[in-house]
A protein has these predicted regions:
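Catalytic histidine-centered segment of alpha/beta-hydrolase-like enzymes
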Residues: 203-212, 216
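Alpha/beta-hydrolase active-site loop signature
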Residues: 7-12, 74, 204-207
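Conserved serine/cysteine hydrolase catalytic core
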Residues: 128-190, 196
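Gly/Ala-rich beta-loop-alpha elbow adjacent to hydrolase catalytic centers
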Residues: 45, 49, 53
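Conserved alpha/beta-hydrolase catalytic His-Asp/Glu region
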Residues: 91-152
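Active-site loop/oxyanion-hole signature of alpha/beta-hydrolase fold enzymes
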Residues: 8-45, 217
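Conserved small/polar residues in nucleotide/adenosyl-binding loops
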Residues: 1-5
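Flexible "cap/lid" loop of the alpha/beta hydrolase fold
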Residues: 54-58, 65-99
């Protein structure tokens, strides 16, 4: 098994863009698969990354072997959408490493986050400059999180999820506040009940932070199964 772990544009060690969208990030995923000449590629995307994965799968069609969506909700049209109130600010400069790491937070917050994983992610999310320490991400990517764009993305991705040509599986944190059971049921029906919805016990939205071993076990099981089974045929 060959793993490629990449940062979407504007995040981590990737360069910043003038504008951001799930479509742009999805195209980045396709480009990596092509450049690396990956055989039978499987994309795993968490939260926003799941949306980007759906877009990548929609343009890659059968060139993508599989897509595993991790705690990404596509809501029924009748559900009330979440309210967004993000304020775009320039990344603050912190005096030292200890101070900036103490400011690292999950959104949404959750209990039982494993400290060693939080510490690892925090260290990978910061950079040193002449004045001190700051976050790596481009704060402007947060502009896509507003009520209008959220509803627009939901409508687009309902159609895209229905039309995917690759194998799809969905992992959901059993205690996730982002991905309620109603959305899981709705997504299952969108895919004609041919793709599994797997609830990870005791997991919240950031599954890799509170239930990492359960997440790894679920991913390995899916990938091994896909390598030895045939996909359900669409009616």
């Amino acid at each position: 098994m060959c793993i490629r772990d990449r940062n979407l544009g504007g995040m981590g060690d990737s360069e910043w863009r003038k504008e951001y969208s799930t479509e742009t990030w999805g195209t980045e995923i396709e480009s990596v698969c092509k450049k690396e000449k990956l055989k039978k590629p499987i994309v795993v995307g968490h939260s926003l990354g799941g949306m980007c994965g759906v877009y990548a799968a929609s343009i890659m069609k059968k060139n993508l072997y599989g897509l595993i969506i991790v705690d990404t909700a596509i809501m029924p049209p009748s559900d009330n959408p979440p309210k967004f109130d993000f304020k775009i600010r320039a990344n603050k400069i912190y005096k030292n490493l200890k101070e900036i790491k103490s400011r690292f937070r999950l959104v949404p917050g959750q209990v039982n986050a494993l400290e060693y994983i939080m510490d690892y992610i925090a260290e990978k999310s910061i950079k040193k400059n002449k004045s001190g320490w700051s976050w790596k991400f481009d704060p402007n990517y947060m502009k896509i999180f507003n009520n209008d764009s959220f509803m627009e993305r939901q409508a687009i991705y309902r159609d895209k999820l229905k039309g995917l040509k690759c194998r799809v599986a969905i992992l959901r944190g059993e205690k996730s506040v982002i991905f309620p059971g109603s959305s899981a049921k709705y997504m299952h029906e969108l895919m004609d009940k041919k793709s599994p919805i797997i609830n990870v016990p005791e997991a919240h939205h950031h599954i890799m932070v509170d239930q990492p071993m359960a997440l790894i076990s679920a991913l390995r099981s899916l990938i091994i199964d896909w390598d030895h089974s045939k996909p359900a045929k669409s009616s």
